[in-house]
Amino acid sequence: MHFLAILVLLAAGAAQAGDGDWPAYGRDPGGTRYSPLTQIDRGNVTKLHVAWTYHTHALEPQSQLNEKAAFEATPILFEGSLYLSTPFDQVIALDPATGAEKWKYDPDINRSANYSEVTSRGVSAWADPKAAEGAVCRSRIFIGTIDARLIALDGRTGKPCDGFGEHGAIDLTRGVELRNRGDYQVTSPPTIVDDLVITGSSIGDNRAVELERGIVRAFDARTGKLRWTWDPIPWAEKQKPRTGAANAWGVFSADRARGLVFIPTGSASPDFYGGERPGDNAYANSVVALQAATGKLVWAFQVVHHDLWDYDVAAQPSLLTFHERPAVAVITKMGYVFVLDRETGKPLHEVGELPMPPSDVPGEKAWPTQLGTWFRPLVPQKMGPADAWGLTEEERLQCRAWIESLRAEGMYTPPSLRGTLLVPGNIGGVNWGSAAIDPEHNLLIANTNRLPFVVRLIPREKLSGEIDEAKRNRLEGEFGRQTGAPYAMYRQPLIGGPRDLPCTNPPWGAIVALDLKPDRKGRSRLRWEAPLGFLAPGLPPGSLNLGGPIVTAGGLVFTAAAKDPFLRAFDVETGREIWKAELPASGQATPMTYAVAGKQYVVICAGGHGKLGSKMGDAVVAFALGE
């Protein structure tokens, strides 16, 4: 491995991970998604075949929740076992060489309840350095559940660790002013620093001004005792009505050597109207660095002021070395990348506040400026009528007329009563799939979406009539009541015509590689970009996608994520797709790779995504080279 690669991984706190391991969600605590394995490379990747397949049976018995279930998990390899979670928070331990089940734990999620999200992105592992070898619960697997529990399991047996909380679990709803029981959840694996388990929460959007608070909590990994809390919007306590959320629902990163945890936060409630939460709304829409031991704020960097567009920081912060400084990269739904000094939060490149259009909605006061960055955006950030697209001229003209009817003055155009074009849409840009960092080629690699959305504010007194009309016309957008605000909202993707195709030029999804070094003229550039998958047969390439990439020292980028059911490999230097394999279902997850007994495997959870409308299933598929 090159010296730079070693330097980056050590800085990210991954020294304890062997080359063949994948012991954390992003492989290392810094979320680089970089593996030093080289057995599978550009010369032999076409010889990959299915080594084993495991079926979780998570969708049994059939329930209405299956319609929104999403198998988004990335397995981890820890102390010789492969651990993963299902959309219903079952935790499974597998033999990494054969896929044979070692144990399975079921938390008995109530499948007749209504949950905002039905997913789990994975589990976290911890070995107690004070416990004797072979002791019960010396190795622990932690999962946060969609019914808001934090559970600790014995890594060897899958049985709950009785000394943690109450019989192995903590009820995370205690002390929370719940508005709706199924809208306060945990969907991402917790972060572990020393003997602390640190977790955020997933809070259902667009329901009301007064929502649950997005407080981050740290618990003792042995006992479950609460050690500290951190409130992302402490100023909201003094407001009437009190805004909520600003929750950290994505995956955190940690620099264990510096004792720091990096937390991505979402928008304050409600997402699309801020008249009840004046100001810049710090520390919503930010990456914050906390002292892991105490929860004390070290610094904060806000990427969107007074968010009106649902531009949460969804991606896991990526730890890397930049200009010979320990850094953290913030990858956003807007397609912007910010690289900050890990110790101070100061940008390590040029950023600036740019003037933005004002709101024309009574009661709203949009923030007058938003940040721009030296790095080239990963996705388009504006669209006009001339950019309308359709398979036929009639479809293109229909899309053009729709765009002409909207308020569309660039990325940060505030929501309006007539309808505003959101470019990019609220799914990104880059979502929770995050980025992979290749230290050998100085690349930041991410999956991106290029589908604008339309959002329209609805005066409260007109909401019932609008909902009735939408039912009559079979409209498939989403209403958000935003109770407590003078306006509800309606949003929908910018798709039209008889085939419900995007009104934007393809590709509608792409994988991109951002060069972390400037070109000869000092400019930022994309080293390459390539369409990712297909939305449907017969359409141009480039699919909506949810999930992320990984990168290996073998010169390969692996990703699934697209709506079609394939795992793909790309050449890290050129972006050329050089291999793909069909999966039993779509892979709306991030793959991982590891080596056992001298053989490298690439594993993906292929279970589809109910909300995306992709092919559903319950498979975990491992690929390896033939004998």
PLM feature spans:
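Short, solvent-exposed loop/turn elements at domain surfaces
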Residues: 29-36, 58-63, 92, 271-272, ...
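N-terminal leader/propeptide and maturation segments of large enzyme subunits in energy/redox metabolism
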Residues: 375-400
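Hard-cation-handling environments
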Residues: 428
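N-terminal, intrinsically disordered, basic low-complexity segments enriched in Arg/Pro/Ser/Thr
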Residues: 13-16, 164
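Bacterial N-terminal signal peptides
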Residues: 2-13
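Repeat-blade elements of multi-bladed beta-propeller folds
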Residues: 22-26, 67-88, 115-149, 182-208, ...
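Mature N-terminal segment immediately following signal peptide/propeptide cleavage
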Residues: 17-59, 74-77, 512
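Extracytoplasmic/lumenal domain signature
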Residues: 46-59, 91-113, 127-132, 150-181, ...
